[in-house]
Structures are given as C-alpha cells and as structure tokens.
Amino acid sequence: MKGLNYMLCIPHTSVSRSMLEAQCRRLINNIPGWELIRVENMMRLRCTFTFPDFREALAFTNSVGELAEAEQHHPELITEWGKVTVTWWTHSVKGVHMNDFIMAARTGVVANI
C-alpha cells in the first residue's frame, strides 16, 4: 500500500460509509502515535503532539489548519501550552473514513514524526 501521507483525500458521496472498527485497527499501525477512540458513539483518530512552548504549538496548529483548508477536511484542534491534540473523524459518515487516516498521516508529516 502506498504510504498514507502520499494519498489524496477522496470526495464523499451519499453512499460513503464509516470504516469498520476492525479496518481501523489494522490501519492505525501505519500512523505512529495515533489512537482510535470512541466519542458520542463514533470512532475517531486522536494524537497529542508536544512542543517546547506555546509559540511552537500554535505554529503547528496553524500548519495543520493550512493542510485542512487545502483538503477541505477539518479536524478538532485543541491548542495548549506545549501541546496540541488533533482529532480526525468525518461528520457526514458518523465515524472514521479513509480520508481521516490520510489526514492523520499528513499531520504526522507536519509534526516531523
């Protein structure tokens, strides 16, 4: 399989569905540091990135924001002093879609992990 960070997000259609948990558990190994969580009965991908100060955390947040805008797929970003928690999921499918794995991998590239 081509590296997730090199893949492009695909547009959603009315028949797009969330991935099964078993599929997610197989793919999670391809994105180091990420975990599969369930919130409001929906699977999500989450990772917390650490930084030496708020300035670098904010710069990372802005870089992820640029990436999200370019793909028109947006994560939940929680920026705090020295850390940023990024959570990806797809509202329209009520769970995790392949695009979320792609964006998580690309987020890791932004963080240099």
From Swiss-Prot:
Protein keywords: Lyase
Catalyzed reactions: (4aS,6R)-4a-hydroxy-L-erythro-5,6,7,8-tetrahydrobiopterin = (6R)-L-erythro-6,7-dihydrobiopterin + H2O
Gene Ontology biological process terms in this record: tetrahydrobiopterin biosynthetic process
Keyword Lyase: yes
E.C. code: 4.2.1.96
Gene Ontology MF term list: 4-alpha-hydroxytetrahydrobiopterin dehydratase activity
TM region positions: none
Pfam family, any one: Pterin_4a
Keyword Transport: no
Family under the similarity heading: Belongs to the pterin-4-alpha-carbinolamine dehydratase family.
Protein name according to UniProt: Putative pterin-4-alpha-carbinolamine dehydratase
